[in-house]
Every structure is written in C-alpha cells, then in structure tokens.
C-alpha cells in the first residue's frame, strides 16, 4: 500500500510538472470557466493515455534494442495500469447506488485500464522470452489469462505462449478464433 501511494504521488508530480498549469477563474455563479485537468493530459497525466505512452516508449526501446529501458517502461505501464484499475474500482463502488453515471464511467475506464494491463503483461512476457527468461514470463502470462479470461484475444495469446513455453500442454479449444 505504501509503495502504491509513493508511486501515485510520483506520477502526480510528474504529471503536474510536465503539464502547463492554468489559473482557475471563477465566474460570478461560482463555476470554473477554465478548468485545468492536469491528470487528464495525454502522456503526462495519470490516466490510460499515460499508460499507452509508456507502452509506446517501451515498444520504441525494443525496436532500438534497448531492452533494459523497455523493461522499465513496461513495468511502469503495468504498475500505473494496476493503480488506475484499483482506483477506478474503488470509485465505482463508492458511487454505486448513488449516481449510476459515475460507476458506468469508472467501469468503462477500468475495462480500458485492464486491457492496457494485459497488453503491458504480454509485452513484458515477450521481452522475458526474448531474454531467455521463460520462468519469469510464466507468472505474467498466467496473470493475463486470469484477468482477461481464456476466451478473450489477450487471454488466448497468453495461453498460447504458455503452450509454446511448455508450461501447459493442452490446447484451448476456444482458441481457434484468436488472431
């Protein structure tokens, strides 16, 4: 829990430092006429766009052969996606039964964060396989199957990787539609 708060605080500081800060001007009725949404900025905030940015940076690092940087970026994307998922779930639960719009929004954002977590895990597992560390890839792949279910395309890719590694032997019959 302490590391989650530390990482969250760090992400907030980075997001605030990288995004321009606007002064909030209030109109006579008390509403903000110019709201600065620092955490919503793409790439620099604490949101799914920032996770996508980390994944893209990791992909670029892999393409340039910098596997250590790629691992760092994928790990950071994974951590941020897990935190976002937990926060969205917490907010969804807090507002359930009070205002249906908020849980719907949080559930939608949570599904997006979950998908990004699965993508980060798949990329991290591929990196571990490339570095001849299949034993490190296995738990990450199992997490994808558990989170996304074997019927999803991400779950099928993860399970297929587990077969290729020799961790499991029985092919999944529902995997015929995977691409």
Regions found by a protein language model. Give the residues of each.
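Alpha-helical linker/edge segments of TPR/alpha-solenoid repeat scaffolds
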Residues: 28-29, 96-112, 163-179
